[in-house]
């Protein structure tokens, strides 16, 4: 969690300071208008029911009976969109047989790292979501795989997500290749060291913008061009972006 937002982690865990964020404020829109988070949560719930084999029909009735969705065309269209998005992910999953839960501990020198990783099927760790996978979520998936590899399992990770292109929901598949046990342990130890530093000072690391920066390097973009792209993303980002995050803006600033 400290790498997902190092600024927030430092303020909350080291200083005990919490700021109000956009999601903490009272919504100014009508209650029947779904925001992106509510749409995502609805689709995630539908996907969980599909995977577990539980009844979608019972859940649908509960949504309308409780008032979480309005009866009529609007509520039905919202539900239909959520189920469609969940179905696009579900149809790309190969969760056959008994799921494996990887658990144990890894000696990282000064720290013994313990934990567990779920959703293992046939030597593959499945990471899926009905939304787009952000850089911070990709980093989390990578750390989980390193933990599994450091336990001695030669497991890869398959990531399944969605992306909206020209108004159409597209499925994206990507993979993280396994690394050998020693390399995985070494990399985990480096993350442990970063965590210790994160309790001393806020790490100057912004997952989304950092990811965009390295993608620009891979595309051989000129430094001036990629710098301009990052500054623009920070200054003109949408709600929920790092440039709009209260914790980041208390610590970092970019030229305008």
Question: What function would you assign to each model-found segment?
Answer:
Residues 1-256:
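Structural signature of nuclease core domains in nucleic-acid processing machines
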């Amino acid at each position: 969690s400290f790498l997902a937002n190092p600024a927030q982690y430092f303020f909350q865990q080291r200083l005990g300071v919490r700021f109000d964020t956009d999601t903490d404020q009272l919504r100014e829109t009508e209650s029947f208008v779904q925001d992106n988070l509510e749409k995502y949560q609805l689709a995630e719930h539908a996907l969980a029911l599909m995977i577990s084999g539980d009844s979608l029909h019972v859940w649908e009735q509960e949504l309308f009976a409780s008032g979480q969705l309005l009866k009529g065309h609007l509520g039905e269209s919202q539900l239909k969109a959520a189920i469609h998005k969940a179905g696009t992910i579900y149809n790309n999953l190969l969760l056959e047989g008994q799921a494996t839960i990887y658990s144990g501990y890894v000696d990282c020198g000064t720290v013994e790292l313990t934990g567990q990783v779920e959703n293992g099927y046939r030597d593959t760790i499945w990471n899926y979501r009905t939304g787009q996978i952000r850089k911070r979520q990709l980093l989390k998936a990578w750390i989980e795989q390193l933990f599994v590899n450091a336990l001695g399992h030669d497991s890869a990770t398959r990531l399944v997500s969605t992306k909206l292109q020209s108004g159409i929901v597209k499925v994206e598949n990507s993979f993280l290749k396994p690394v050998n046990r020693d390399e995985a342990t070494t990399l985990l130890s480096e993350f442990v060291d970063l965590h210790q530093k994160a309790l001393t000072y806020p790490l100057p690391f912004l997952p989304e913008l950092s990811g965009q920066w390295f993608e620009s390097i891979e595309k051989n973009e000129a430094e001036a061009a990629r710098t301009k792209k990052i500054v623009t993303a920070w200054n003109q980002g949408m709600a929920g972006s790092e440039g709009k995050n209260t914790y980041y803006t208390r610590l970092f600033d970019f030229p305008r």
